[in-house]
């Protein structure tokens, strides 16, 4: 089939979505469907290390119910007690079982294969944490897995600690120092802090941390305090400073134990005899380094006081401010009192402070929003989506126009950056089948709401619909499916509202979804299924379990959802479209096996996981039974993600330790 015909088909289908979206569908083809009454796969395949690793990923999904949600202390900070931040016991037990299964299966393999699979496990560990590029952005689950790996490969885990900064951030070191009891890991984390702070001090002071005197630190502090933003930027020009000074805990603040242990680690014992003096010297050094970084929090005070930093709220450069900083201080930067509507007279100034610099800060922020320069890519999609959802479900009652614009701008930046990355990847590796021909399918059944993952499903679905070659096309389903065409000219709040206008909270009738889609395809004379279905779900449309070792038992296969869908598509003259099962809730049943052709599996909430769906080189393949599918399977797709060159340093470090199977 020519590319012209393929483009024509997905264009026709996109047009059909637009027409159909005005009418909510009523599926007359289903006569009866019990809630969670279908069969599914009980395992990802035969007992192999690859299947165990994929099972681990399937369960490495941050639970949204019954998990860490500690209350703030009186000082406004969260407690550092590790018991307050933990993975639920049921999930720990589940993960423990799967990890041990991997260990047992891998230990029985030849040494070269052991090396291969343990290298993949360690790559996966850092993929689990990866904040930049494709990865799951998970903290607690990464800490859990890192500790499990340390129990098997202590020397290797210790050697990998410095790499954590490349995939996570300095706060991860704080967790290791406080919560992991192994002294080798704690020392490695403290040494990593020292390495970066020494490098920063060499650039700023011309000497390492312990050689900087209090007089030098005070002098530079005073000099920097008097500088304007542009002058500070000129001072640090050409210097590559880390964020260690920003993240190392402050005295009297959360995780201050890290600071105490670091001082004991970094400074000679003789110096520590006058500990109060060392603390004071260290404080001045860190303050100077933080000023060099242009940290926004330091400017969130009105200048003019003797000895204070002469950079105020108006000095914050909104187009350079990190997405997390903007999200955390959104109301303050907008100069708005939370949940207090602005009067007409306050629209330009805000209603929180009358200080000139606070008002200018608001104006600067609004200007940056209008120019489309506000950052949002690195935000936690789940947190951003839940903030949007909160306002949508309260009918936007306490949402100011400025806050709406700010949240929408950060959403748009996130979407735009992912689309740019996807387009660049596709251009670099053209595919016979364009991987961007994707239709998101959002499960809005009652179980999604019970698991509290419905908001994440909507967010990922809308994000996917925005970067797809079928822009705005998506399907929602509960008992009945709804064909939607999301207006891409509307902001994300309006898009959420459009999705929420459909049927929600009933049973999980996924069969009605593909039947409705087939009706649409046939009615509009679409000649091929040259698209992918990205199904965002908790997987609870199945309850019973069936074990199909290789997926070749046709009668059994036709009883599971994937088999039923393929049969229905074939009856209408279509091949099974590439199908992505996006799992949003850790559970023990699977919608396919690791080798099922035409299928991919994605697990988690990170927006960057969309890269594995919208990128890749795909062709068609026909098996001995005559089934034509896209030539991809869950294991191959997963393997491609974790063997990305970004994780090569992890593999190289494993080989360098020569520990166990890496010898």
Regions picked out by a protein language model, each given a short descriptive name:
Residues 2-456, 466-663:
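Long lumenal/extracellular ectodomains of secretory and single-pass membrane proteins
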């Amino acid at each position: 089939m020519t590319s012209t015909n393929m483009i024509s088909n997905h264009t026709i289908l996109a047009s059909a979505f637009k027409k159909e979206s005005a009418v909510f569908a009523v599926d007359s083809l289903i006569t009866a469907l019990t809630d969670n009454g279908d069969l599914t796969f009980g395992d990802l395949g035969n007992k192999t290390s690859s299947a165990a690793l994929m099972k681990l990923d399937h369960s490495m999904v941050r639970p949204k119910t019954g998990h860490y949600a500690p209350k703030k202390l009186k000082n406004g900070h969260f407690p550092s007690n590790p018991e307050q931040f933990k993975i639920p016991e049921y999930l720990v037990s589940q993960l423990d079982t799967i990890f041990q299964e991997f260990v047992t299966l891998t230990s029985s393999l030849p040494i070269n294969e052991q090396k291969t699979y343990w290298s993949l496990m360690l790559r996966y560990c850092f993929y689990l944490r990866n904040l930049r590029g494709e990865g799951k952005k998970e903290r607690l689950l990464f800490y859990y897995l890192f500790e499990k790996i340390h129990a098997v490969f202590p020397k290797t885990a210790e050697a990998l600690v410095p790499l954590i900064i490349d995939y996570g951030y300095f706060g991860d070191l704080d967790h290791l120092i406080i919560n992991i009891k192994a002294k080798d890991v704690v020392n490695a984390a403290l040494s990593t802090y020292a390495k970066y702070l020494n490098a920063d001090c060499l650039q700023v002071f011309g000497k390492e941390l312990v050689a900087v005197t209090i007089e030098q630190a005070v002098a530079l502090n005073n000099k920097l305090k008097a500088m304007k933003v542009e002058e500070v930027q000129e001072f640090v020009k050409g210097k590559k400073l880390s964020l260690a000074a920003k993240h190392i805990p402050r005295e009297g603040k959360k995780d201050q134990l890290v600071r105490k242990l670091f001082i004991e680690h970094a400074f000679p014992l003789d110096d520590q005899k006058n500990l109060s003096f060392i603390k004071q010297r260290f404080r001045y050094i860190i303050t100077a380094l933080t000023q060099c970084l242009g940290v926004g929090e330091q400017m969130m005070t009105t200048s003019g006081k003797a000895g204070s930093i002469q950079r105020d709220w108006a000095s914050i450069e909104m187009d350079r401010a990190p997405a997390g900083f903007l999200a955390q201080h959104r109301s303050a930067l907008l100069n708005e009192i939370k949940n207090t509507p602005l009067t007409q007279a306050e629209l330009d100034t805000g209603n929180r402070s009358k200080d000139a610099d606070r008002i200018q800060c608001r104006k600067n922020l609004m200007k940056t929003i209008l120019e489309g320069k506000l950052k949002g890519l690195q935000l936690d999609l789940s947190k951003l989506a839940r903030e949007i959802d909160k306002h949508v479900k309260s009918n936007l009652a306490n949402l100011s126009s400025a806050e709406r614009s700010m949240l929408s701008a950060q959403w748009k930046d996130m979407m735009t950056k992912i689309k740019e990355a996807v387009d660049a990847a596709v251009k670099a590796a053209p595919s016979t089948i364009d991987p961007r021909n994707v239709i998101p399918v959002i499960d809005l059944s009652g179980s999604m709401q019970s698991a509290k993952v419905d908001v994440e499903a909507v967010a990922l679905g809308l994000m996917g619909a925005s970067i797809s070659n079928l822009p705005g096309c998506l399907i929602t389903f509960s008992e009945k499916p709804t064909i939607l065409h999301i207006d891409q000219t509307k902001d994300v709040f309006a898009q959420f509202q459009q999705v929420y206008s459909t049927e929600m909270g009933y049973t999980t009738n996924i069969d009605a979804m593909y039947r409705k889609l087939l009706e649409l395809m046939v009615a509009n004379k679409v000649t091929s299924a040259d698209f992918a279905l990205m199904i965002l779900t908790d997987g609870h449309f199945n309850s019973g379990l069936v074990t199909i070792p290789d997926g070749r038992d046709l009668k059994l296969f036709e009883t599971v959802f994937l088999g039923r869908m393929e049969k229905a598509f074939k009856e209408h003259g279509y091949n099974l479209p590439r199908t992505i099962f996006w799992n949003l809730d850790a559970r023990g049943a699977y919608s396919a096996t690791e080798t099922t052709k035409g299928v991919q599996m994605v697990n988690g909430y990170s927006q960057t996981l969309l890269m594995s769906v919208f990128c890749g080189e795909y062709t068609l393949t026909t098996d001995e039974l005559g089934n034509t599918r896209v030539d991809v399977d869950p294991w191959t797709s997963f393997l491609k993600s974790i063997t990305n060159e970004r994780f090569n340093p992890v593999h190289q470090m494993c080989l360098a330790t020569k520990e166990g199977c890496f010898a």
